[in-house]
Amino acid sequence: MFRTLLKSKIHRAAVTHCELNYEGSCAIDEDLLDAANLGENEQIHIWNINNGERFITYAIRAERGSRIISVNGSAARRAAVGDLVIIAAFAQVEEKEVAGFSPKLVFVNPDNRIKEERSTIPVQMAD
């Protein structure tokens, strides 16, 4: 049996471009792709913090060091430049490998520079 687990996450990235007439996808700075262990053409989920939109597309490379997050094609109607988004990908993991599996979590500052990388999410505590 397999479980679907979070594999990669880029947290609170700022959308830098929205290109409606570009072939559909999301262009992501290659530095961020590498840090989050995301591959070109890999399916990604995008969750827009500003408006609550959630959609699925695929990752393409943006110039390394550019800090670009470009939402393209029809998905460009679901984001605006400056919106904060969470970009995530999932993996099918065999049950026997679940205990040793950990995601690549990348946290960025407002200009999409990496500020922290982790492999765990803290337990949410009650108030």
Swiss-Prot record:
It is found in: Cytoplasm. Keywords: Autocatalytic cleavage, Cytoplasm, Decarboxylase, Lyase, Pantothenate biosynthesis, Pyruvate, Schiff base, Zymogen. The active site is at S25, Y58. Pfam families: Asp_decarbox (PF02261). Binds 1 pyruvoyl group covalently per subunit. Its EC number is 4.1.1.11. It is an enzyme of class 4 (lyase). Pathway: Cofactor biosynthesis; (R)-pantothenate biosynthesis; beta-alanine from L-aspartate: step 1/1. It comes from the Bacteria. One of its GO terms (biological process) is alanine biosynthetic process. It catalyses: L-aspartate + H(+) = beta-alanine + CO2. Its main location: cytoplasm. GO terms for molecular function: aspartate 1-decarboxylase activity. Is synthesized initially as an inactive proenzyme, which is activated by self-cleavage at a specific serine bond to produce a beta-subunit with a hydroxyl group at its C-terminus and an alpha-subunit with a pyruvoyl group at its N-terminus. Substrate binds at T57, G73, S74, A75. The modification Pyruvic acid (Ser) is found at S25. Its cofactor is pyruvate. GO terms for cellular component: cytosol. Belongs to the PanD family. Catalyzes the pyruvoyl-dependent decarboxylation of aspartate to produce beta-alanine. Heterooctamer of four alpha and four beta subunits. This is Aspartate 1-decarboxylase. It comes from Polaromonas naphthalenivorans (strain CJ2).
